[in-house]
Every structure is written in structure tokens, then in C-alpha cells.
Amino acid sequence: MYMSTDEVRNAFLKFFESKGHQIVESSSLVPHNDPTLLFTNAGMNQFKDCFLGLEKRAYTRATTAQRCVRAGGKHNDLENVGFTARHHTFFEMLGNFSFGDYFKEDAIAFAWEFLTETLKLPADRLLVTVYETDDEAFDIWNKKVGVPADRIIRIGDKKGGKPFESDNFWQMGDTGPCGPCTEIFYDHGEHIWGGRPGTPEEDGDRFIEIWNNVFMQFNRQADGTMEPLPKPSVDTGMGIERISAIMQGVHSNYEIDVFQALIKAAAEVIGYEDLSNQSLRVIADHIRSCSFLIVDGVMPSNEGRGYVLRRIIRRAVRHGNKLGAQGAFFHKLVGVLAEIMGTAGEELKRQQAVVEKVLRIEEENFGRTLERGMAILNEALDNISSQGTDGKVLDGETVFKLYDTYGFPADLTNDVAREREFAIDEEGFEKAMEEQRQRAREAGNFGTDYNAAIKVDTQTEFCGYTGTKGSSSVAAMFVEGNEVESLSAGDKAIIVLGETPFYAESGGQCGDAGEIRTESGVFRVEDTQKLGNAIAHHGVMAEGVLAKGDEVATIVDAERRAAISLNHSATHLLHAALRQLLGEHVTQKGSLVKADGLRFDFSHLEAVTAAELKEVERLVNAQIRRNHVIETNVMDIESAKKKGAMALFGEKYDDEVRVLSMGDFSTELCGGIHASSTGDIGLFKITSEGGIAAGIRRIEAVTGEGALDAIEAQAAKYEEKLAESAQKAKSLEKEIQKLKDKMAAAESANIMGKVQDINGTKVLIAALEGADNKNLRTMVDDIKNQVGSGVILLANVNDDKIGLIAGVTKDLIGKVKAGDLVKMVAEQVGGKGGGRPDMAQAGGTDVAALPAAIQTVQPWLEERL
């Protein structure tokens, strides 16, 4: 019976829902509450605290289709991806879980029913394994389910290994929950090489594990003894790719519908015809992990999860390059992936444009260095080959140079080397890497962090949410990392109290400042930091003395605290506004909240435009004007997520969390100090925006009076610039006039050749273009001086307007008056004018009539001279 991957997923979830299981959404690929994990790599990750008894949920049965990534860290399948039938960087794990509810009998019965009745797999193609001493599981399979004994294989401990070190015994660590497993295998047939589990040929591809059921039955003690758990649990996992291959009648995972669609799409965008090429498999796998990592907030970078993403992208691009890809191609597969993932691709569809953009930019950036790096790598490999030595090995220094200088991940270099049958000097590479780390450590060693050096057992109770004053006693004091019994004036120290209203730096909010007072002295608190479960007050003994055990009054600088709280609340509004405007890919990557402003780092690929920044300000200030009451509620983490609260990636949260809400605009998990209402913020103003790393932008902003100061400073700058511009304009006008005067003088000289004689009098009649009336007057005066005695008429056309200037030397005004002359011409061109007998001007609008009007001047003068 053929089933698509999407149909398999839905059938699994519906089956277990019918068995009383709660369908739980796939958790993020970035584990929120487990700092030990780079990526979510198993279905049980999100339920870890449930299995440990640290968290209780509203259900005791759950089922999921969990997205997983294995690339980087302990679980790294990257170098095998594309070269085997079942290795992937991204996969989906179908799972059903029991938290102290049902156990082995039901788990085994559920698995068998789903496989043989829902999926209708032939029972004779299935065989199972149990832990060697797990007679209970063996009997359930044999006597209750009916699997023949010869198809149930007992698997013991590995030879030479520790007790319980077996493929069929699961353990979280050296101590803690553990228990036996039972695995279900599918027989792909005699035509495929491979032996049954437990035989020397078990690594063949004939018998493939499809479902693992882990029975958390014991709690292993430090001495190795196994104590039965009061409430045993079940954790199961079935890879959707493997079971889909069976349901679609194929052997390799890369032959199922999801991968075939991606392989065909990749071949099409690259222009490559051989669909069996392994590079197409690599690309098809990598687009899945890259796309969903970006959906879950990971951005390409040079560290941590971002660097793993960058490595996967670059590996895919390099394989596309091998196949002859021209230009960016990888991002073009996102739409195909979103469609073929069916119901599991809805979030990818919503963020498709963002994912495509991230991949395209990263691919284009890498494309500029790929060619150069490949040239260096191939040259190095060619040099080694030419030496003809046995055992071709690429030295670690070259691998490091490619990584450090050209951004070539070591595994990409390893891929290329392996294709050319070279080995990598991994030891030499690690040595070069360690030398670089040491240089970085030495460069960053600026002083002693006494806070990190101090160990203290005290647990400080924080009482600062409701006030800025309190009383307590001194639990411990430290000077330069050493515990002391007393302090004197001038001592720089760290004080730990039993209870304090001082907020310790956390979540980007800086620590409080203020005073710790006694009758005998004052300690000025300059900063407050966390110290394990204690709160450390850093500062100086301003006056008097202080001793361990003294009763003290604690006084936070309330004005400073208030300013910090306003900026912290504004940070939440800024985060929400950025996500609303730029997209849900925007996630907080860091922040700093101080009394005089805030700094917010977030994931985004491009500079935020001036128009976008203006809109962000508008959105934030609109929420400030609405004066939302800032509500704080304490609830369990699951309830917080259902409420839509944003959690910060990498942050570890307690079972109970503080949820901060500002109307329906912003809901976040936050333990910081905030304003009472958004209106208290007053005003929000962005002062700068810029990039701090690949894909990470930074906004700095101020609020309240600081925002007013920033606006006034900006206005003052504008006024200053306007004054400067006005002054420059005046200077330019003067320069322009000087140039015009020079041009007029030059023009006067040029037109002197047009002077004619009428009845013994020198006459100049000329039409010009582009001059202004002031220049014409200057020209007339210059010409009068040059001719000594004469009559001048100059006409000028400028912007479809006519300017006329007439000049007559004083010895001729008894015969010809300038006003009469200019009036006569003006009347012919639709204008009028007049002036003194020796100088007159007029205007007109009929440009077409000007040539004919000019022709009438000479006859008119001949009659009068």
C-alpha cells in the first residue's frame, strides 16, 4: 500500500491520538531549555524534564513528528550525507511517549498494531530485538503479540564494553534514568546483502531498524546499582524517511517522494541530467536542514549554530558548483520543499521569502570566495600529487589557512580531498586551531574577573520587583577574590546578602547601583551581578566600616532603576515592532539596557532603511501613547508558550516563568524590571542602526527625556545645516554673479563686431540668449564706454520671456531717447516699458515676433539720426 511521506506522518499522529495521546507540535530545532544540545536531535528532547520528573504536564501520553538536525557536535552525520542511503543532516522522528502512564505491553502492542494494521506491513517481513535479559519484553512479543521466537533476537552488551553498554540498553549518562530497548527491523529481501541484527553482517542494508522503543525502567546509582523507577516511562522513535521508503517500495531514503522532488528540482535549476549523482542527494538533504534552521531563527554566522548552518550551505553550494551551477541556485529549492513537506511545511511557507533571501545572500557571498579557495586547494593537492609520495595527505596548515582566510569549513576541504583520494592531517589542523585560540585568549586577557573566581554557597532572595529598599544581613564579603570578615573605607569589594532589592545583571538589563548602609558605614554599590544562586554587590566602602553578619539597609538608586526599567520595556516594544515590520525571522541576539539608553541586536540580513526605522519608531510610540498596563504573570513554560510568549534562544528557563505582556502587541518571557505602563516610557527615539556581524543588526535608542534631548539635538543639527546651506547659497550667488559679470564683459567684447554706422552714428543692435536684465544693463554700460557716442539696443530671451535694454549716450539724447526706442520694440512683442532718456528697459512675451521687431530698429533710427 503506497503512502506519501505526508500521509505516513498524519496516519501516525492520528493513530496515537486515537490511543489517548496528546499531539504535541514539533519543538524548535534550537533547544530552548537544554544548553548541552546544539540542535534538537531526537523526539524526546522537548520532554527531557518530564522523564526526569522535573516537569509535569497536563497529559501523560504524547505523540509528535519532531524535526531533527544532526550536524556538528557529538551527533554529526555531515560527511556521510549523500554517500549512504540513510544519513541525513535533517530528518523527522515520529514518536509516542508515556510519562509514567503505560509501559512495555501497551507500547509494544501499539507499535505492532500501527505497522501491521494501519500500514499493513507483512508480519513476516518484521523482526524484533530485545535486551539480552529483558524476558518481559521477549514474552510480550512472543506470547501476546505472537511473533515467533526465532524472529525475536536477544542483544547483549558489547564485547569489551561496560555493563549495559548495548545497542538495546538506553542510558542518559553514567547515572540517572535508563532502561532496555526493543527495536523493530524490516527485511528488505534476500536480494540485498546483510545479516540479521547481532550477526557479523548486521551492518548490511537488508535488515533496517525502523522503530526503537526505550523503556525507562531504572535509576542507576553512582555505585552502579539499578533501582526501579516508581513510574516507568516510554520513549519511542521511528524515522519517517525509513518507514516512507518501505511504504513507497524503495530501498534508499533518497528515493522517497520528498527527496525525489528536491533532486529533480535541483537538477533542473542547475541544468544537470543525471538524477543519480550523489551531489544532487547532498543538495536535496541540505536544503531541508538549512531551510528549517532559518525558520527556527538560526542565521549564518561564524560561531555556534550559525556556523554549522553556514557550513551546510557552503557544502551544498560547492556540490552545485561541481555540477556546473551558474549563479545562485540553492534558494530556488525552498518553494519546492515547502510544498512537498505538506502539513509539516506550513511555517516554512509563511517564512519562504525570508528563507530564500538568507540563502541567496549567503550563497552569493560565498560564491565570491569559492573559486579562489578551490584554486588554492587544488593547487596544494596537485603539488602533493606531483611529488609522487605514498599516502597522499593534505597538511593541517593548509586546511587551517583555507578555513581562517577563505572561510572554507574543514569538512568542505575534507570532501574535496576525499574525492581526490587524499587524507587530511586532522592533528595538524587542530594544532593550528588551538594556537589561534591561545592567541585569542591572550589578546582578551585584560584583567581578573573576581566575580567568576568566587565560590559561595549563599542563596540570595531577590525582593526588588515591588520596591527599591529593604533590610538584610551580610552573608559574605570578598576583596580581590578572597573572603574577608570586615571592610574599611576605601576597600573595593563584593558583598553578598541574604536578601536584596538590587537587581543582578541578566537578560541584557544592567545591574542596579545604590547604597548598603549601617549605623557605622556606607558601602556604595556600583554594579550588581549574579554569583551562582547568590547576588553579588560590587562597589567600594565609601565611609566607615562593615563586618560580616551586620544588619544593613539596602537602598537602590531609584531614579537610575526607573530609567533602566523604561528602557527595558521599550526594548520589548522594539522587538515586537521589528518582528511585525520586518518579519518573524527577527529574533533577539543580544541586548544592553542601561539608564541612558538601550541597545538591541537582532537577526536580519540587510540594513534597516530610514523609512523602516521611521515606521518602527511610529509603531513603538503608538503603543506608548496607548498606555498599556504592563502585566506580569507567573506560569509554567508550556502555558507561556500557548500564550504566545517569545522565549530567547539559548536561554534556560525554570519550570515557572515570568510572562510580561503589553496589550496584545508584545508578550515575552522576562525576569527583568519594567515600567508600570507603556505610557511611562514617554517617547522612543532610535539614534543609530548598523551591522555588527553577518546577519546581525544593532539598533541603539533612547526614551523619555533622553529621546527629547536626541530630537532637540537632531533639530539643532538641522538648523545648523540650514544656516550653513543658506550661507553657502549666498556665497554661491555671489560667485554666480561674478561669473555672470565676467561673461557679460566677454559678451560685450564679442558683439562689438556688430557695431554699424547710421548717418555717422555708431549703432549696435543685437539679440542674446540666457542673460538676465542686470547683465544686459552692465553690457550696455560697457559698450557705451567703448563707443564713446552711439545708440545700443540689446534683446534677451530667457525662459520664454523677452528682456529689452536700450542705451543712448548723452550727446545723442536730443535726437533719440532710450525710452522711446525700447517702447517701440516692446509694443511689437506684446510688452511695454520705458525709462530715462539715456537708459531704458522693457519686457515682452511674444518670442516669435522678436526677430521682426529687431528689424524695425534700424529704419526707426535712420529717421531720427
Curated annotation (Swiss-Prot):
Taking the first listed entry, what is the main subcellular location of this protein, grouped into a coarse class? cytoplasm
This protein's cofactor list reads: Zn(2+)
PROSITE patterns linked: AA_TRNA_LIGASE_II_ALA
Q: Identify the SUPFAM superfamilies for this entry.
A: Class II aaRS and biotin synthetases, Putative anticodon-binding domain of alanyl-tRNA synthetase (AlaRS), ThrRS/AlaRS common domain, Translation proteins
Q: Which Pfam families has this protein been placed in?
A: DHHA1 (PF02272), tRNA-synt_2c (PF01411), tRNA_SAD (PF07973)
What is this enzyme's EC? 6.1.1.7
Q: Which domain of life is it from?
A: Bacteria
In terms of InterPro entries, this protein maps to:
aa-tRNA-synth_II/BPL/LPL, Ala-tRNA-lgiase_IIc, Ala-tRNA-ligase_IIc_anticod-bd, Ala-tRNA-synth_IIc_core, Ala-tRNA-synth_IIc_N, Ala-tRNA_ligase, Ala_tRNA_ligase_euk/bac, DHHA1_dom
The reply to whether RNA-binding figures as a keyword in the UniProt entry is yes
Is tRNA-binding tagged as a keyword?
yes
Give me the residues that bind Zn(2+), please.
568, 572, 670, 674
Enumerate the UniProt keywords alphabetically: Aminoacyl-tRNA synthetase, ATP-binding, Cytoplasm, Ligase, Metal-binding, Nucleotide-binding, Protein biosynthesis, RNA-binding, tRNA-binding, Zinc
Gene3D superfamilies linked: 2.40.30.130, 3.10.310.40, 3.30.54.20, Bira Bifunctional Protein, Domain 2, Threonyl-trna Synthetase, Chain A, domain 2
Per its record, the protein catalyses: tRNA(Ala) + L-alanine + ATP = L-alanyl-tRNA(Ala) + AMP + diphosphate
Per the record, the domain comment is:
Consists of three domains; the N-terminal catalytic domain, the editing domain and the C-terminal C-Ala domain. The editing domain removes incorrectly charged amino acids, while the C-Ala domain, along with tRNA(Ala), serves as a bridge to cooperatively bring together the editing and aminoacylation centers thus stimulating deacylation of misacylated tRNAs.
> What does this gene product do?
Catalyzes the attachment of alanine to tRNA(Ala) in a two-step reaction: alanine is first activated by ATP to form Ala-AMP and then transferred to the acceptor end of tRNA(Ala). Also edits incorrectly charged Ser-tRNA(Ala) and Gly-tRNA(Ala) via its editing domain.
Q: What family does this chain come from, according to its entry? A: Belongs to the class-II aminoacyl-tRNA synthetase family.
* Protein name stated in the entry: Alanine--tRNA ligase
This protein's gene is called alaS
